[in-house]
Design a protein with these regions (language model features):
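Extended, folded cores of ATP/NTP-driven motor/assembly subunits in large transport
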Residues: 2-316
Length: 316
């Protein structure tokens, strides 16, 4: 009788968890990233592949002529690849006056260490310089997120991939809701995704753009530090497939392999709850997030600085 009650309770818990996730009632349900597939590729819950490139800057001063050359070069070289329905690109730009002091302090770390080695007490001078420079600087970061989605596959390929994944999960017999689904990736997408990443890297390099494809640990750290910088240490790194695990089995361990696998990536990326302030804004720690939509695009191509100059005074 007890076993029947336990089974019914487990089924109800599973159904309620699935319903809660489907209705987006938990903050983790908004995270689409499931696990890592390779050194520089993440996997979404539906099997799509994701890579993140960090733009460090350009190798020359950019005026209007250089800007148009870079724009036209990217457009000409990537039009065919991005014309396919399954490839998409997201661009993230971040600006913060709060982070700049820490960045400048890190840049001065070698100088401070040299002064310490020479036993020179110039802390007051360094603090004054740090404060002065901070008043004239802002922290900026740019990331390009490349997606290769299931729609790249033919109907037969997609059905076969879904069937194989379902069979593997049933065969392994673990609960992918509480751990990372290490077989989430769709093998047929790998070559297509890797080809696009390689092509994009070569195009950016040829145009003088300094870009780096992040390894999965740095990529997840970047995501979390953007979402919740107050709760993310510089040395924090996610636990991903291939990393060493030190599982602690509970006294109620019933042999479910999910308890000794890598923990859910959604829980690692979103470490604490968010608060809905209204239908349009959400608060995470000390930050408030909201959406901005551009309904009518300009007829002529303009630099991002045009938009940036208009939004900066608003304090966004």
């Amino acid at each position: 009788m007890v076993s029947i009650v336990d089974n019914v309770s487990e089924v109800l818990d599973t159904l309620l968890a699935a319903l809660s996730s489907g209705l987006k009632q938990t903050v983790e349900s908004y995270c689409d990233i499931q696990t890592a597939d390779s050194e520089d590729t993440l996997v979404a819950c539906d099997g799509s592949l994701i890579s993140i490139m960090k733009i460090e800057g350009v190798k020359a001063l950019v005026g209007q002529e250089e800007y148009e050359r870079i724009h036209d070069g990217i457009l000409q070289n990537l039009s065919n690849s991005l014309a396919e329905q399954g490839h998409s690109i997201q661009v993230f730009f971040g600006y913060s006056r709060d982070k700049v002091k820490e960045v400048i302090k890190d840049n001065y770390a070698p100088t401070v260490q040299t002064l310490s080695d020479l036993k020179l007490n110039l802390d007051d001078l360094m603090d004054e310089r740090l404060t002065h420079i901070t008043n004239y600087c802002g922290f900026e970061e740019i990331y390009i997120v490349v997606w290769s989605k299931m729609t790249l596959l033919t109907g037969d390929q997609a059905k076969r991939a879904a069937k194989e994944k379902s069979e593997k999960i049933s065969e392994k017999g673990y609960n992918v809701k509480t751990c990372q689904n290490v077989i989430a990736a769709i093998p047929d997408l790998r070559n297509l995704h890797d080809s696009l990443i390689k092509s994009l890297g070569q195009v950016l390099s040829s145009l003088g753009v300094d870009a780096e494809t992040l390894n999965v640990h740095d990529a997840v750290h970047a995501i979390r530090s953007i979402l919740d910088p107050e709760f993310t240490d510089k040395k924090w790194r996610p636990v991903l497939p291939g990393d060493k695990l030190n599982p602690k089995l509970s006294s109620t361990f019933d042999g479910d392999i999910s308890e000794v696998l890598w923990p859910s990536l959604a829980h690692q990326i979103i470490p604490r709850d968010a608060v809905n302030l209204d239908l349009h804004t959400v608060k995470v720690g000390g930050l408030i997030y909201s959406s901005v939509f551009i309904d009518l695009f300009p007829k002529e191509v303009q630099s991002f600085m045009s938009l940036f100059n208009r939004t900066l005074p608003t304090g966004i």
